[in-house]
Amino acid sequence: MAMAMGHVMLREFHLDNPSQYFTDYVRRYTDMPMLVMLEERDGYYAAGRMLRAADLVDSLGQENNPEWKTVAINSNGDMVAPNGSIGFRWGEKGKWNLEQRDGTSGDETELQLSLLGSQDDIAEVGFPYFGGEGTEHFSKVELENILLHKLPVKRLQLADGSTALVTTVYDLTMANYGLERGLNDENCATSYDDVKAYTPAWAEKITGVSRSQIVRIAREFADNADKTHGRSMIIVGAGLNHW
């Protein structure tokens, strides 16, 4: 059900009617803008590791720990190694923070969350799906074990001469949640009533909670977080991590 709530929140507060607070938060304080290298599989791609400054020609000017510095694309279309990744922890002062600054120049920079609209190509990326395995106590929704989604990608020349396809964590997240963004992705939903991975209708079949209730609680939870700048909380009972 939490996945279906996430589907609603991302659809309504990031795509259809973007919340300035949410957008600014994920841009500044999460790895959503960071680039991820895609690995070739049998007829499709899969998410690999983060792109690092050391993967690129001249390491984006980073001489200190470039193999530990993640990379993003800023609003000007330039690749940068922004402050805050673990590579800035040692050997440099004043850069292990979440200020929106280029780690090389120190200039303020705004990171792109998505490659959509500036992509070099569209690639099919596979995501594992585990909701098709049911038991007598767990209802299932049978879909393919690997769900292929269409993602915007950039094609980069690496320091070793090879070429890599990259996308952002944000784009991977949107695809994994099954959110259609104009790419004609048959495994993405165009309605909350579509029984596709992580929609309210999908969750209703597994949990028995009506899709309308899932949509309502997700919408209210996100709306409160938007208006109060994050003051929404899910409280669970005592468990393994409680103590």
Language model features: what each stretch is:
Residues G230-I234:
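Generic beta-sheet signal
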Residues M1-K227:
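Long, well-ordered, tryptophan-enriched scaffold segments
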